Amino acid sequence: TRLSRGLGDVYKRQVSLRYFNVYGERQPLRGTYAPVVGLFLEQKKAGKPLTIVGDGEQRRDFTHVKDVVKANLACIDSVIGGYQTINIGTGKNYSVNEIAAMISDNIEFIPERPGECRETLASNSKASYYLDWEPTIDIKDWINEYEV
């Protein structure tokens, strides 16, 4: 926005980190827009079917909270000038169906929500350039290690 850029010009440094579908320890487990990974794990734990919204072919770039923390720390230590918006994601996406299949085969589809995005996929080029940051945790590996 113009206000953000104006403040960036005055204070010479303003950075926004844009997170992509954060999951991991202490993730929210309730609410309409709670992260799907946490919801699925909670549903499996309760012995319930995993509820997939729509056809499940929506694709998401899932980022582990530890990678988000590392990106924030790298940003604090960086010497970025001006105004920058930096994506924090993995640069790889999975369909909701793929994530569900990693957790359980007990699946139920529910109606699609209007206006839901079909795909998210981060470009980490700025994070790599400005923060010397790369993601280290893949969701497949995390789910396999998690007690499912």
Can you annotate each of these PLM segments?
Residues T1, R18-Y19, D55:
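Short, well-ordered beta-to-alpha junction loops that form the rim of enzyme active sites
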Residues T1-Y11:
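Single conserved hydrophobic/aromatic residue that forms the stacking wall/gate
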